[in-house]
Structures are given as C-alpha cells and as structure tokens.
Amino acid sequence: MDFEFSPEQQTFIEQVEAFLDANDDPDIFDVTRENMAQIVDTPKRRQFMAKLGEMGWLGMTWPKEYGGSEGEGVYEYLLNERLAGRGGPQIGKGVGIIGKTLIAHGNDFLKDEFLPKILRNEVEFAVGYSEPNAGSDAASMRLKGVRGERDGKTGWILNGQKTWTTSAHFAEWYWLGVRTDPDNKHRGITLMLVPLDQPGITINKIDTMGGVPMGDERTNEVFIDDVFVPDEYVVGEVNSGFQYISQALDLERFTMFTYSPIKQRLDVLVDHVRTETVDGEPIKDDPIVRQRIGQLATEAEVARVMGLRVVSESMKADAVPGTPPPTVESSEYKLFATEFSKRLADA
C-alpha cells in the first residue's frame, strides 16, 4: 500500500487550503461542533457548499456526462479532511450516498431532477435508515410500503417511523429506506425519494440523556402516515434497496468519517496535560498519565493508517476493473475510529 500522495494530489491540497483561507468564516467553520460540524444546516453553510460546486469540487468523481470530472475518490477524501480539520461542512451525503446511487441505479427522471441540483448544492437531503428497532441492523427496518394509487398515479403508500434523522428539520427531501416485502429481510427493502414538506410527515426533536438534542445540535424522529410516493420516485429496482444502501455506506465510511477531528481532540488533551497541575505538581510528570497519553497517541496513529488503507484500497478498486470495494476494511475503520473516539473522550 502506498500512502504517499502524488504531486497532483499535493497541488490539490494546496488549492483547497488556499480556498479555505480565502473563505474563512466562524459561521461556517467551527471545530467546537465536532461531529455535527459536517452538516449543512445554515444559509451561510449552504452558500459555502455552493462555492465548492463552482470550484468543481462537488461531483469530482462523477462521470462527465452527469457534470463530473471522473477524478479519483482520493480527492473527495482529501477535500473532506481539510474541511473537517477546520470544522466545516463536508461533502458525501448528496454527492456520494445519493448522487452516486442515482447515477448507478436511478431512472432518467430522478437523474434529471436531482443530479444538477446536487452539483450546485441547491437541494438538501435527510437520510432515513434508522428506526427504533433498526439501528446497526439496518435490514430490520419496518417502515411499511404497500402498493396504491392516488390522483391517477400508481405508487406506494407509506406508514411507519424513522429515528436519528439529523437533517430532517431543514432538508427538502428524504432518502428513505422502506420495507416493501415483509417476508424477505435483506431483499425486501426499497429506496425512495420523498419530499419532507407534505401532509402526513411529522418531525419531532429528540432530546438526548443530557436533556438537549446532541449537545447544542438537533436530531429527529420522523413519523410517516399514509404518505404517497409515485413510482417515478423509486430508486432502482423494488426490493433492491439494501444492496444500494450497503454500497453507499462503503463510500460514507471513508469520505465522511475523517481523521482530522480525532487529531484535534488528541491535541487538546495533550495541551491540557502539558499545562495543568494537581497539588502544585505538573500532571505531565505523572508516569501513569504519560503512559495513557502514549497509548492514545498510538491508537490515533492506528486510526490514521486504517483510514489511509481504506483510501488506498478504494483507489485500487477504482483503477482495476473487477476489484471489489474495501467493504470489510471500511467497516473495521469505522468501528475502530468510533470506539477510539469514545476512549479519547473518556480520557
């Protein structure tokens, strides 16, 4: 595995850094928002993402026929690392999870409707997979879709609930997993696009154990009652949604789960240890503290290398036809980095 970036990639990094310097704004970049910094939930953040589109950085890996530049996936990773390092909104959901799935599996109507808007950042999506009894096991989702007709159109009538939908209160469209075959767990899920501003959709704020939603941020539960979805808003084949979801999650795990926030938290901890005292004694001189910091620094380096491994394997999959994506490696990285972030927070 080669973890060195090419001269072209180094040039791109420099271009991104210069662009971010020129567009620095505390209303856009805020590292204190931590994991919630990546969402595009304010007018200024939406305007900033539109500027990324003007630079040609939304859809860098898309085919040219859909407005992309057919670049390597590593460029999306490099862009997100720089955005995450400053606490800025990141690409991945619209461009990656939704855009790439539409390119691969969407009908012409959906491609024409959404792909140009994604490249210009004119539409915001919420992703609806998780349910009260379907979290890590997304294939257990039960939000029900049955065949129906309304206003002369055929489609699906939806009823059920989703939870932990972070963007539902400001997004325009719902990227929704629906149970369309109750007898087949993995081959009974269909992806649909649903407008959120319609009767039958109720969005409620979720409060966490601290009494506030996700710190200073918000997540939601969404109730769907007799909502009709025309057939043209079904993504790909009926009952093939879980396959599409799995493919998209491979992308999310290495483009949206970045290393920079981990490094920031470790640096804050190290700075604290360097300056604080207990009973007049510097805690940096405590051998137990030093051992713990060394262990955390080692684990942070492991997380960095695991992420780069996924990037390297993804580049190989892009370059060599027939090479499978690093599904296992990306899952390992996501799990390790998440668990390590918890250990770092507890330290």
What are these regions (language model features)?
Residues 154-155, 159-206:
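A short core secondary-structure module
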Residues 143-147, 266:
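A structural signal for short hydrophobic beta-strand segments in well-ordered beta-sheet cores
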Residues 70-82, 137-141, 223, 229:
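Structural signature of FAD isoalloxazine-binding scaffolds in flavoprotein oxidoreductases
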Residues 46-124, 167-173, 300, 314-329, ...:
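Internal helix-loop-helix
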Residues 3-5, 11, 203-305:
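Glycine-rich beta->alpha junctions and the first turn(s) of the following alpha-helix
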